[in-house]
A protein has these predicted regions:
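ATP/NTP phosphate-donor binding region
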Residues: 1-60, 70
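Secondary-structure boundary/capping residues
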Residues: 36, 81-82
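Active-site acidic Asp-centered loop
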Residues: 63-64
């Protein structure tokens, strides 16, 4: 399955969104196909990660700040902490 990339373009006062085109190009060059989801509101990373996990994704890349990484990890971990 293709890696799931979850990006928060608002992270770093918009720096993540500005850097995204270059990051995406480098990810595609290194990994080939990637499946991208962008957050539209704060805290959406967790739900996006849970949806991706349910769809069978098992490789995740978080693009943003520490809150983005935390949200993605919370989505992957599951409610029972596993």
């Amino acid at each position: 399955m293709t890696p799931k990339v979850i990006i928060n373009p608002a992270a770093g006062q918009g720096a993540a969104g500005k850097a995204w085109p270059g990051i995406a190009a480098r990810l595609r060059a290194a990994l080939g196909e990637i499946d991208i989801s962008q957050t539209a509101q704060a805290g959406e990373e967790t739900a996006l990660a849970r949806q991706a996990l349910a769809a069978g994704h098992n490789h995740f890349i978080a693009v943003g700040g520490d809150g983005t990484m935390n949200g993605v990890l919370n989505g992957i971990m599951g409610e029972d902490g596993t």
